[in-house]
From Swiss-Prot:
Residues 2-182 form the KARI N-terminal Rossmann domain. The gene is ilvC. Substrate binds at S252. NADP(+) binds at Y25, G26, S27, Q28, S51, S53, D83, E84, V85, Q86, G134. It is an enzyme of class 1 (oxidoreductase). Involved in the biosynthesis of branched-chain amino acids (BCAA). Catalyzes an alkyl-migration followed by a ketol-acid reduction of (S)-2-acetolactate (S2AL) to yield (R)-2,3-dihydroxy-isovalerate. In the isomerase reaction, S2AL is rearranged via a Mg-dependent methyl migration to produce 3-hydroxy-3-methyl-2-ketobutyrate (HMKB). In the reductase reaction, this 2-ketoacid undergoes a metal-dependent reduction by NADPH to yield (R)-2,3-dihydroxy-isovalerate. This is Ketol-acid reductoisomerase (NADP(+)). Mg(2+) 1 binds at D191, E195. It catalyses: (2R)-2,3-dihydroxy-3-methylbutanoate + NADP(+) = (2S)-2-acetolactate + NADPH + H(+); (2R,3R)-2,3-dihydroxy-3-methylpentanoate + NADP(+) = (S)-2-ethyl-2-hydroxy-3-oxobutanoate + NADPH + H(+). Binds 2 magnesium ions per subunit. Belongs to the ketol-acid reductoisomerase family. Pathway: Amino-acid biosynthesis; L-isoleucine biosynthesis; L-isoleucine from 2-oxobutanoate: step 2/4; Amino-acid biosynthesis; L-valine biosynthesis; L-valine from pyruvate: step 2/4.
C-alpha cells in the first residue's frame, strides 16, 4: 500500500526564505497562490501582458509581474499553464532565469515526462498535483481542511527536492488531507488514461451512446437525457462518498441486479482490449505526439471535433431542461 504523508511529515519553514512565483492565475493558479500566501510564504504571480487575471490577483493582495520578471525574482517557479503552451513560455521566459539552486515545479508531468521541457541539471524539478479543482483546493483550505495531493521528484539537484515539494504541498493545504509520493511517469500516464478511458472520453461516449439508443428507439429525448446524463451525478456522488459498494447499497435491488448482469455486457473483452491499446499509446508517447502536433498546426481537428460535439442534440435538450433546475440558477 502507498504511504500517505501529513502535516507532521512536512516542514513549511524550508520555504521561508524563498520567493514563490505562480505562473498563471486560473483555477489552480489562484488557489495555489492564495493558499501559499495565507500559509506565510512570499508569493508573486507571473502573467502575460494584458492578462485579464492580473486585476484579480492584485485585488487579492498579490504582486503581479510579467512571466520573465517573475521567473527572475523567484526561487521556486510553479508553472500552472495549459500543457500546450508550457513549452513556449518556458523556453522564452523562464529558462533564461533558471539559476543553480532554483526549483522548477509543475502540477502535471506531461511536459517533463514527454520531453517537451528539458530543464538544466542544476535545478530541482518537482511536482505537486492536487487531486481536485482549484476552487475546491481553495475552499477546503479556508475551512481548515485540504485536498489530497500527489508529489514527485524528477530531479533533485539540491538534495532537498523532496522536502521542498512536501513543504509546498503543505503550503497549499495538501498535507491536511494527505499527500502521496509518485513519479512524473506514473502521474502522467495514469492521469491521461483516466481522462481518456473513464472520466472524459469513456463517460462522454457512454452517455451519448445511451442517449442516442433511447431516442432512436422512439423515447422522448428529455427522458433519455434524465436517464443517461442527469442522473450520472447522483450515482457518482454515491461512489465518491463510499465506493461502488456504497452506491450499490443505496440503489434499488432492480438497479443493482441490472448492474451485475448487464454491466459486463457493456465493458466487454473487446472494450478492455481497447483500454489496453489506449494505455499503450499513452506509454509510447503516441498520444503526446498527436497532441503536440495538433497544437503546432493550429488545432484544426481539435477545433472541428469541439464544434461537432457542441452541436450534438443532447446539448440542446440539456440546455432546455437545465433551465428547470432552480438549484443551478442559484450558482
Amino acid at each position: 500500500m502507498a504511504r500517505m504523508y501529513y502535516d507532521s511529515d512536512a516542514n513549511l519553514d524550508i520555504l521561508n526564505d524563498k520567493t514563490i512565483a505562480i505562473i498563471g492565475y486560473g483555477s489552480q493558479g489562484h488557489a495555489h497562490a492564495l493558499n501559499l500566501k495565507d500559509s506565510g510564504s512570499k508569493v508573486i504571480v507571473g502573467l502575460y501582458s494584458g492578462s485579464k487575471s492580473a486585476t484579480k490577483a492584485k485585488d487579492a493582495g498579490l504582486d503581479v509581474y510579467p512571466v520573465d520578471e517573475a521567473a527572475e525574482k523567484a526561487d521556486l517557479i510553479m508553472i500552472l499553464l495549459p500543457d500546450e503552451v508550457q513549452k513556449t513560455v518556458y523556453k522564452n521566459q523562464i529558462e533564461p532565469h533558471l539559476k543553480e539552486g532554483k526549483i522548477l515545479a509543475f502540477a502535471h508531468g506531461f511536459n517533463i515526462h514527454f520531453g517537451q521541457i528539458i530543464p538544466p541539471e542544476n535545478v530541482d524539478v518537482v511536482m505537486v498535483a492536487p487531486k481536485g479543482p482549484g476552487h475546491l483546493v481553495r475552499r477546503t483550505y479556508e475551512q481548515g481542511e485540504g485536498v489530497p495531493c500527489l508529489f514527485a521528484i524528477f530531479q533533485d539537484a539540491s538534495g532537498q527536492g523532496r522536502d521542498r515539494a512536501m513543504a509546498y504541498a503543505k503550503g497549499i493545504g495538501g498535507t491536511r488531507a494527505g499527500i502521496l509520493e509518485t513519479t512524473f511517469r506514473e502521474e502522467t500516464e495514469t492521469d491521461l488514461f483516466g481522462e481518456q478511458v473513464v472520466l472524459c472520453g469513456g463517460l462522454s461516449a457512454l452517455i451519448k451512446a445511451g442517449f442516442e439508443t433511447l431516442v432512436k428507439a422512439g423515447y422522448q429525448p428529455e427522458l433519455a437525457y434524465f436517464e443517461c446524463l442527469h442522473e450520472v451525478k447522483l450515482i457518482v456522488d454515491l461512489v465518491v462518498e463510499g465506493g461502488l459498494a456504497n452506491m450499490r447499497d443505496s440503489i434499488s435491488n432492480t438497479a443493482e441486479f441490472g448492474d451485475y448482469t448487464r454491466g459486463p455486457r457493456i465493458v466487454t473483452d473487446e472494450t478492455r482490449a481497447q483500454m489496453q491499446k489506449i494505455l499503450s499509446e499513452i506509454q509510447s508517447g503516441q498520444f503526446a505526439r498527436e497532441f503536440v502536433m495538433e497544437n503546432q498546426t493550429g488545432k484544426p481537428v481539435f477545433t472541428a471535433m469541439r464544434r461537432q460535439e457542441a452541436e450534438h442534440s443532447i446539448e440542446e435538450v440539456g440546455k432546455d431542461l437545465r433551465a428547470m433546475f432552480s438549484w443551478l440558477k442559484k450558482r
